Amino acid sequence: MTHELPPTIDPVAAARWAALSMPVSAGPSGGAPASAWLHEEVARRMEERLAWIKLRPQQWAHWEAVRGGLQAHKLLAQRYPDARCFVVESSPGRLQRARDVLSKPWWHPGRWKAAPTRFEAPPEGSLQMLWANMLLHQVADPQAMIAHWHRTLAVDGFLMFSCFG
């Protein structure tokens, strides 16, 4: 048995990739802002798979929502309107972008009805669902990221993720 780690992205390349500013465009027909087309499409297909899962999360997190799919986030929020959502971003710029796009104004009736979105890391062991679309292939240490996600999941919680490779 070997003790070598599987090949992964070079840490310098991962840091450079993470520092890139990801364009956020208008959605279809000039609608809600969207992330990269492929990321939105993969996320849309992942969201469809949630119909097979009977557990309705009370708390869930969207890891790197700006890169992973802003339109998909809206689909998830519609599917789980009563669940508390955490949005986790690794850079201050993307965190602000997520706040700008995903926060409802104080006067919006939807803000009064739904659980508020929190733009911070969730407590360990608190999530019933963790959503990470098209992210794992971008991090320097995928095993450490999966271990971190595992710590945030509650017993019987589940991870929905996609990646290249």
Where do the model's predicted regions map?
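Class I SAM-dependent methyltransferase SAM/SAH-binding core
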Residues: E47-E124, M129, A144
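A short glycine-rich, Lys/Arg-flanked "PGG" loop and its adjoining helix->strand segment in the class I
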Residues: Q143-F158
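Short catalytic micro-motifs in class I SAM-dependent methyltransferases
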Residues: M134-L135
